[in-house]
Curated annotation (Swiss-Prot):
PROSITE patterns from the UniProt entry: RIBOSOMAL_L30 (PS00634)
GO CC term (a single one): cytosolic large ribosomal subunit
A family per Pfam: Ribosomal_L30_N
Name this protein carries in UniProt: Large ribosomal subunit protein uL30
Tagged with keyword Transmembrane helix: no
GO aspect biological process, one term: maturation of LSU-rRNA from tricistronic rRNA transcript (SSU-rRNA, 5.8S rRNA, LSU-rRNA)
Key words of the record: Ribonucleoprotein, Ribosomal protein
Lipid metabolism among keywords: no
């Protein structure tokens, strides 16, 4: 006796076709995402290479200008820095209300916390008010990069989130053309048009006590007097390296 052919109910057939269609759509969508991600990675690498060329060109321009000045018997005057990195080196005790408010304004609410500040007439005045409680200076590209990659966190929905990949940066700063961690670094280093948004996105850096200590007999004297506080110009890079 021939086996009877068992027909599947129409609802099952429809579901099977639907599942097959969804599976095809899923595979197509996954393939499209892979292509898009590959293109995005290539674009980011291209932008990073352009940033690197920009940094190198700026360094060469300064070196060439110094050589020309020396050859002509004159002095090269460097452009006024546009960026400082500020580290709070004193706790909350014995800080008057006005400097305390400035520290809060600059988001330096804890000892050993650090933030980037755009140099303007207004911020220069603020730095004078809090000078006895902070160390600051002009960070190099290398210092900014190391800070962001090692200690960088973003402020997302009032939460402190580690910058573990480019997608976090793009999701929060993509509307400003900042698509990757290196784009973020570039915006900070160059004090670009969206510096404010980029800097506000960065959570204040939480640094450690300097390895080997402060190396000064009296911490709360000005840097130029052998202490730790105040403007240490390019020497901020050495301090950050010891605290990072």
């Amino acid at each position: 006796m021939a086996a009877e052919k068992i027909l599947k109910p129409e609802s099952q057939l429809k579901k099977a076709k639907y599942d097959e269609k969804k599976s095809e759509e899923f595979l197509k969508a996954r393939a499209a995402r892979r292509v898009a991600n590959k293109q995005k990675r290539a674009a980011i690498l291209e932008r990073n290479a352009a940033h690197q060329k920009e940094y190198e060109a700026a360094e060469r321009a300064v070196i060439d200008a110094k050589r020309e000045a020396k050859a002509s018997g004159s002095y090269y005057v460097e452009a006024q820095p546009k960026l400082v990195f500020v580290v709070r080196i004193k706790g909350i005790n014995k800080i008057p209300p006005k400097p305390r408010k400035v520290l809060q304004l600059l988001r330096l609410t804890q000892i050993n916390s650090g933030t980037f500040v755009k140099v303007t007439k207004a911020t220069s005045e603020l730095l004078k008010l809090i000078e006895p409680y902070v160390a600051y200076g002009y960070p190099s590209y290398s210092t900014v990069r190391q800070l962001v990659y090692k200690r960088g966190h973003g402020k997302i929905n009032k939460q402190r989130i580690a910058l573990s990949d480019n997608a976090i940066v793009e999701a929060n700063l993509g509307k400003f053309g900042i698509l990757s961690i290196d784009d973020l670094i570039h915006e900070i280093v160059t004090v670009g048009p969206h510096f404010k948004q980029a800097n506000n996105f960065l959570w204040p850096f939480k640094l450690s006590n300097p390895s080997g200590g402060w190396g000064v007999p009296r911490k709360f004297k000005h840097f130029i007097q052998g202490g730790a506080f105040g403007n240490r110009e390019q020497f901020i890079n050495k301090l950050v390296k010891a605290m990072n």
